[in-house]
Amino acid sequence: MQLWTRIRRYPRLGLILLAFIAFVALGLPDGLLGVGWPAIRAGFGLPLDALGLLLTSSVAGYMTSTFLSGFLLARVGVGRILAVSCTLTGLALLGYTFVPAWGLLVALGVFSGLGAGAIDAGLNTYVATHFGEGLMQWLHACWGVGITLGPLIMTFGLSALNTWRFGYRVVGGFQLLLGAGFALTLAAWSQVPATAAADAPQRLTDYRTPLGATLRRPAVWLSVLLFFLYVGAEGGLGTWTYSLLTEARGVDPTLAGFFAGSYWFTFTLGRVAAGVVARRVGVNKLVLGGLVGALLGTGLLLWNPGELANVAAVAVIGVSIAPIFPALMSGTRTRVGDRYAANTIGMQMTATGLGMAAIPSLMGVLARQFSLEVIPLCLLAIYVGLLAIYTLTLRGPGATVAA
């Protein structure tokens, strides 16, 4: 009751809570697919690597809506975008559970991606504009909460109800309720003054740097490559952990679901902890330390001395990589210079979509060609590459010039 009174007295508190809940909801579908995929492909009679089609369709929708987000935010408003996008995502996820053919499910993936991309871009832009850097860290931690709960919801549906559809119906229904919440608060979203945080640095969007000038800088492409590889590895392990453990290593499905959930659970804890120590530790130590930890965890997953080693491996990888994405994003201006940072950030977000689609899909192709045991080898190669590329960016001209 006291919380509701405070929300009515301070509307911004209500918007913050709604934004946090929305990011929990944004993470839920990402956590469902990895655990649910073996049952989905069995139901539709699909090969192992057919997952790439669904990933590609959803990422295509995601990239389209994020690319258009600035145009839409200026003309439609964030409240309407969030209400429509949550509703669209909810309907698409519910549609997964009713379509009779795999091709229709893939088509619905486009609409799921469109909604998710608009939610992601809309809330990131809104929180950065109105609430500053601190709340942005907690916002992304909420995504980790969602992607941690996703495997647990799907595991319950598979073990207790013997269906993958339960998970998507729960999450789809939640998205529809969230869409209604945004629709009921449209006025509040438009009333909050668009003032930047008091402690914000000079805005990167103040620079009117031509895109062509940005594209000519090697440091920019190295920075974009970092995001492509990092997000691909993050999504690759999240997508294939359950299949690796159940189909290649004979782990009990319920236990494997717990292992998959532990990856995102430790990922979330790592991101929360990193937000506390980031100012003292610094961006470079967070990235380098995270990559070293990821290599150790991947080595343990590759070694595979026993079931407990599997859960320890995915947990170590999760907590290690957690701070890398926000640290890389924060360090963009240092790597490429202030004048090129705004354009580079947009390119980096595009690279995350491409990486999330391409790398897990490629892992699936290799797993089908050889075996699922190729997944840890792929991760090892990616993390070694990330460490080499990031070290190179520290020595390049973009690391020292803030033009």
Where would I find each of the regions flagged by the language model?
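Helix-breaking motifs and short loop linkers at transmembrane-helix boundaries and internal kinks
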Residues: 45, 77, 98-103, 250, ...
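Extracytoplasmic gate region of multi-pass secondary transporters
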Residues: 33-34, 217-261, 265-268
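A late C-terminal transmembrane helix in Major Facilitator Superfamily
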Residues: 338-372, 379
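Helix-to-loop junctions at the C-terminal end of transmembrane segments
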Residues: 65-78, 270-282, 367-368
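Cytoplasmic helix-loop-helix junction between adjacent transmembrane helices
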Residues: 108-143
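Interfacial helix-cap and linker-helix signal at transmembrane-aqueous boundaries
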Residues: 40-41, 72-73, 153-162, 245-246, ...
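Helix-loop-helix hairpin linking two adjacent transmembrane segments in secondary transporters
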Residues: 139-190
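Conserved MFS/SLC helix-loop-helix module at the cytosolic interface between two early adjacent transmembrane helices
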Residues: 64-103
